[in-house]
């Protein structure tokens, strides 16, 4: 008894519940002096509402019948502060079996109760906001809250003999990842992540969840508690974004291919246009030389025309002189007439040649003008082709950056999925 008095709070009551004795531990715990508490009723140490309740009346009835009580009690200190005690009420009888007194031993568990209450409040808050389910170490369902039942579409009775496996897709639950999950949980590892599960109607459900191993008072692992939130809508958005990213990646890759092909075509076009420009330059030079030659021919024709005119004049003079000579100059006159006719034909042919050369020169000048215009167009075409080629190269470079960005975005989305 002395050892108990040193380690625990003790208070004694008569059969009517009035305090007859209390040790120092009890006085210190409740904040009373001895003279303040002796003779006071037990109800003074209790919450007012409880002291007036039917439960309180039955409590003392059981003690008066000699029934032992052990458990947690909420009592009130001298300052009015609630205090939780782990207590035993022990009825003591005399030799005739009459109730002599009730001895109470108690220890302060106020801090423990408040800690437990805080933990329970947190668990209650989690249970109100999240889906919660408990499993034994073989995956059999022990309990589930209403949020879990609503999320997965089950009734409470349906989970009485259920196992974690039935919430998983066949390909997953029969594979190595599922076996590894439960190996880790049975080793006491905490597992968190996004998990694809199956609704009662067979549709996929995405859960953001944590699997939490739970230990008993002896430190032995005995169950797993899972907290989860339904993130199916978010995952569907992620999947849609991933699909769009994949499509964008495909299109941007095709665009890059087209741009590269276009760059090659334009480069080939530039090379061909450069060849055309060079050919036009050479043709322009040849036509220029031809124009010079036609001008030289014109000069020669003019010289021939002048010679023909002079020959015609000389033939006319010779005919005049032959006429003066009479019969002696008749033969010379015939020759002079032939020379004159030849000079006239030469003059006529020379005129025709001059006209033809004039037309050739006119055509040549027109061709030269057209060639110069074509050269200018060819040069402008080369410049435009080069500009187009530079633009295509820019597009190709930009498309390459787009492809890289889309690839990175796609990888990020796939990692999230």
From Swiss-Prot:
Residues 242-417 form the Methyl-accepting transducer domain. Disruption phenotype: Cells are named mutant biofilms and do not disperse upon induction of the dispersion by succinate, silver nitrate, mercury chloride or sodium arsenate. They are resistant to hydrogen peroxide and more hydrophobic. They show higher intracellular levels of c-di-GMP (5- to 6-fold higher than in wild-type), increased adherent properties and impaired twitching motility. They display smaller, densely packed and symmetrical microcolonies. Keywords: Repeat, Transducer. One of its GO terms (biological process) is signal transduction. It comes from the Bacteria. InterPro entries: Bact_Chemotaxis_MeTrfase, Chemotax_Me-accpt_rcpt, MCPsignal_dom, PAC, PAS, PAS-assoc_C, PAS-like_dom_sf, PAS_fold_3. SUPFAM superfamilies: Methyl-accepting chemotaxis protein (MCP) signaling domain, PYP-like sensor domain (PAS domain). CDD domains: MCP_signal (cd11386), PAS (cd00130). GO terms for cellular component: membrane. Residues 1-66, 115-188 form the PAS domain. GO terms for molecular function: protein methyltransferase activity; transmembrane signaling receptor activity. NCBIfam families: sensory_box (TIGR00229). Essential for biofilm dispersion by sensing environmental cues. May be involved in sensing and transducing signals within cells, resulting in the modulation of c-di-GMP levels, swimming motility and adhesiveness of the bacterial cell surface. This is Biofilm dispersion protein BdlA. The gene is bdlA.
